[in-house]
């Protein structure tokens, strides 16, 4: 299985690694990370308008101008112009490098631990390794997630930039505000990882039955497998993702100190169960283009850097 799946970026921060580097590739780790960071930067920038629309639909679900994707995008352009569709993208790109580096490192340590017990890695061990990698990375970059949400939601002139946004949050709410939404974020990892990896494994089995060589899969096979498994993972964990975003943005909306239980109750009382899936349309729409852009840029970067991926 090619290592390119490790860093295929669909713009979803909970995305778990599906494979790890072989021993022969250890010396070129920085090339994989650089390729992945560049691929993620291009794909996230390309789909940033959909991501900003998603956040607005999640947070301002009661406003009529954000009831659907097109009206939401129109409202954003009217408020701040076309360039405003990329608000929050800078820090979203900035956090890619540490995010990937942490996931790689934790996954490698987990692989070494499990391989010390027996020679092959079981499905449940892959879930544990993937979940742990995401949990550690999200714990360390959660402050950047909060800043990204606030910058994405800002209106024209609210913040002078990233540092000004961080300063205002710290002055008003203290350091604890930088970990708003942490609990639902952690809880969302388990359903995401289990669903993502289960669907991915199922697709690998189906491709093998169809006669595909999974030791050296084609780009279409790799992209379709990761895209579908990621989409299923997002749907499984989406209510928790929505609650996390609402908690991170709560001061922007109501000026209160939100709790996970309180946000859940408010959504259910005001919008019912469908309210837990507000913003799902732009989320699903950006998975395929984000994955496709990421894959193409990643392969191009590997060629540029002279990386040879060894099959198992």
Curated annotation (Swiss-Prot):
**One GO BP annotation here?**
mitochondrial ATP transmembrane transport
Tissues expressed in = Mainly expressed in testis and at lesser levels in brain.
Q: Where are the transmembrane segments?
A: 33-50, 88-107, 131-144, 182-200, 219-243, 279-298
Q: Which InterPro entries match?
A: Mit_carrier, Mitochondrial_sb/sol_carrier, Mt_carrier_dom_sf
> Does the keyword section mention Transport?
yes
Chief localization:
mitochondrion
Which membrane topology describes this protein? Answer: Multi-pass membrane protein
Q: Name one GO cellular component term.
A: mitochondrial inner membrane
- Organism superkingdom: Eukaryota
Catalyses which reaction(s): Mg(2+)(out) + phosphate(in) + ATP(out) = Mg(2+)(in) + phosphate(out) + ATP(in); ADP(out) + phosphate(in) + H(+)(out) = ADP(in) + phosphate(out) + H(+)(in)
Cite the entry's keywords alphabetically.
Answer: Membrane, Mitochondrion, Mitochondrion inner membrane, Repeat, Transmembrane, Transmembrane helix, Transport
One Gene Ontology molecular-function label: ATP transmembrane transporter activity
Keyword Magnesium assigned to the entry: answer is no
First and last residues of every Solcar repeat: 27-113, 121-206, 217-304
The record's subcellular location field reads:
Mitochondrion inner membrane
Alphabetized Gene3D superfamilies for the sequence: Mitochondrial carrier domain (1.50.40.10)
Q: What job does this protein perform? A: Calcium-independent ATP-Mg/Pi exchanger that catalyzes the electroneutral exchange of Mg-ATP or free ADP against an hydrogenphosphate and participates in the net transport of adenine nucleotides across the mitochondria inner membrane.
What is stated as this protein's family in its record? Belongs to the mitochondrial carrier (TC 2.A.29) family.
By what name is this protein known?
Calcium-independent mitochondrial carrier protein SCaMC-3L
Organism field: Mus musculus
Gene of origin?
Slc25a41
């Amino acid at each position: 299985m090619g290592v390119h799946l490790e860093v295929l970026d669909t713009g979803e921060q909970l995305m778990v690694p599906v494979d790890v580097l072989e021993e022969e590739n250890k010396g070129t780790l920085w090339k994989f990370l650089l390729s992945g960071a560049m691929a993620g930067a291009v794909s996230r920038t390309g789909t940033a308008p959909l991501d900003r629309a998603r956040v607005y639909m999640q947070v301002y679900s009661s406003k009529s101008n954000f009831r659907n994707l097109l009206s939401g995008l129109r409202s954003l352009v009217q408020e701040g112009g076309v360039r405003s569709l990329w608000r929050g993208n800078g820090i979203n790109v900035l956090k890619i490098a540490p995010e990937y580096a942490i996931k790689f490192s934790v996954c490698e340590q987990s692989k070494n631990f499990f391989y010390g017990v027996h020679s092959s890695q079981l499905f449940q061990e892959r879930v544990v390794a993937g979940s742990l990698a995401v949990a550690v990375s999200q714990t360390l970059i959660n402050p950047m997630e909060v800043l990204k949400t606030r910058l994405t939601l800002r209106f024209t002139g609210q913040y002078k930039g990233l540092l000004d946004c961080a300063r205002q949050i710290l002055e008003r709410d203290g350091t604890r505000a930088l970990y708003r939404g942490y609990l639902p974020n952690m809880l969302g990892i388990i359903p995401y990882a289990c669903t993502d990896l289960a669907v991915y494994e199922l697709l690998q089995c189906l491709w093998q039955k169809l006669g595909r060589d999974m030791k050296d899969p084609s780009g279409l096979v790799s992209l379709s497998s990761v895209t579908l498994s990621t989409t299923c993972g997002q749907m499984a964990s989406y209510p928790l993702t929505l609650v996390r975003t609402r908690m991170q943005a709560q001061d922007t909306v109501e000026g209160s100190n939100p709790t996970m239980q309180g946000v859940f109750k408010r959504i259910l009382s005001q919008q019912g169960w469908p309210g837990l899936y507000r913003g799902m349309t732009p989320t699903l729409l950006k998975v395929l283009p984000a994955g496709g852009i990421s894959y193409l840029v990643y392969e191009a970067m590997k060629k540029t850097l002279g990386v040879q991926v060894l099959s198992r």
